[in-house]
Design a protein with these regions (language model features):
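C-terminal and late-domain segments of enzyme folds
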Residues: 1-37, 49-64, 144-145, 149-352
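General beta-strand structural signal in soluble alpha/beta enzymes
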Residues: 13, 71-73, 97-98, 129-132, ...
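Charged helix-capping and loop-helix junction motifs
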Residues: 57, 111-116
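Glycine/threonine-rich flexible loop motifs
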Residues: 103-113
Length: 352
């Protein structure tokens, strides 16, 4: 795989159902990548079956997250997609966001048109380009047009279509865990082992920066690497289970960074703040100093631990001796029917 991203802008493949009401982590990250308070975002709802309300929702969301301006552009056919009036808002956009819906419709309208080329040009000059659900799938060179759910990969489980090609050498699927799309993505990797299978959960984004993939959000990004796969995809019958042996599986939660070129995990988790690192270094220095002082006295740390254990044993012996010297009660108390003390045997049995 020689190149996985065609330009300097960040690419956001969002698995759908991104949080719009609470933390809005994924959308906030997109706005920041698009320029934060200077972000000029174009919303493209072509895939959606909803009316103008979908534009209003994202306009309000991105404005609340600090974007400078948000406009909606909705080409409904290829004629619209070649009309300069639909294309001009993309010319100075710092972010392009494609909504969910019917990805085959989105691909049929946008790919191979002036509008699609304008999106690619925006990305090449540094704009963040993102999409949720259908808008995520179209980012790749090859996209899943439709398919069936299920955990087992089967022959002819899904259909491919052409995408924008911003992510090359990979297939992106969405709503991944929530709609059980493991089988259909793995079947495509089995049939095209050179393609990396990337499945994105809901409220999660696979963020492509150069040859690195970063995970943001509540779920995980699942990656199927079939570069060493053994498969029967070339002769399996229709709907038959596919052989997929030797596939490397990566499940990446938030903060994970993956090298798409070498297909390995680069990092996971965030480094502590500089102040915490300084405190940890100071604590380690104190421990080293204490160890030297103990060694200088000729007494090992084990000595102090042994002395503490011996002191504990002496205390136990004294307590036992004090117990033996107590006078016995003249009338032992028994737990009878009228006693206020509980029958210990019954109480223990009742708690097992």
């Amino acid at each position: 795989m020689s190149e996985l991203q065609g330009g300097p802008g960040a690419l956001f493949a969002i698995g759908g159902a991104e949080d719009k009401l609470k933390k809005r982590t994924v959308l906030q990250e997109f706005v920041e990548a698009a320029g934060g308070s200077k972000a000029r975002i174009v919303v493209v709802p072509t895939a959606s079956a909803l009316g103008p309300d979908v534009i209003d929702v994202y306009r309000a969301l991105f404005a609340a997250l600090g974007a400078e301006s948000v406009v909606g552009v909705r080409p409904e056919n290829r004629e619209d997609a070649d009309d300069p009036a639909f294309i001009s808002p993309l010319n100075d956009a710092t972010g392009v966001f494609m909504t969910g819906g019917n990805q085959l419709k989105l691909a049929g309208v946008v790919t191979g048109t002036a509008f699609g080329r304008a999106v690619t040009a925006a990305h090449a000059r540094g704009a963040a380009v993102g999409g949720t659900s259908a808008g995520a799938s179209i980012l790749a060179e090859h996209m899943i047009a439709f398919g069936r759910s299920g955990a087992t990969p089967r022959q002819r489980m899904s259909q491919l279509s052409g995408g924008l090609g911003l992510v090359q050498g990979a297939i992106v699927d969405q709503h991944f865990a929530q709609r059980n799309r493991y089988g259909r993505l793995l079947s495509l990797v089995a049939q095209s082992p050179g393609l990396l299978g990337i499945g994105v959960d809901e409220d999660t984004a696979a963020v492509f920066r150069g040859s690195h993939l970063e995970v943001v959000g509540r779920g995980a990004v699942t990656i199927f690497d079939g570069s060493r796969i053994t498969s029967n995809g070339h002769y399996a019958g229709r709907s038959e289970p596919l052989l997929a042996s030797g596939v490397v599986l990566h499940v990446l939660p938030a903060t994970a960074t993956f090298d798409l070129q070498d297909r390995v995990l680069l990092s996971f988790g965030k480094q502590p703040p500089a102040t915490e690192l300084a405190e940890m270094e100071a604590a380690e220095a104190d421990l080293r100093k204490l160890a030297k002082e103990i060694a200088a006295e000729g007494v090992s740390p084990k000595y102090y631990a042994d002395r503490k254990r011996r002191a504990g044993r002496r205390t136990s012996k004294k307590s036992a001796a004090a117990g033996e010297s107590r006078p016995e009660a003249t009338e032992p108390i028994t737990a009878g029917a009228d006693s206020e003390l509980p029958d210990r045997t019954q109480a223990d049995n009742g708690n097992t």
